[in-house]
Amino acid sequence: MAHPFDNFDYARYDIVIDYPQYRFYPTPYSISDGLRISRIALSSTETRVEFEFTNTVFDRFNVKRGTYIKASGTNKLEFKRAENVAVAPYMSTFEKSGEILKFALIFPAIPPKTKSFLIAEQDKKGWKFKGIKIR
């Protein structure tokens, strides 16, 4: 079955990176273990981060408000919108184990010369992707 991102037009982005390198730090509870970054798209107006979440045990998933990106020497930039995933307190639900949810978080643009950045769901308790390489 086709997914909306399969036909997404990335022409407006200056840089598109599939499956970038990063270090992942899941939450203390195992719900985030199936989470990975599948694509990053950068433009002068926004940073688009696409994820894939593979459901293993739990039957629902969401993204917390306040999830942010941060490049070295910059302030935190919280996401502006989410595509194809529920934002807390709402939940995206699954029919079965092994089901994959593809979603995107859209953030403000990061500085053009940024070499790497991090994404964090929350400062202390949430999942984190660090050292996401873009150059």
Regions found by a protein language model. Name each.
Residues M1-R135:
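Conserved functional micro-motifs across diverse proteins
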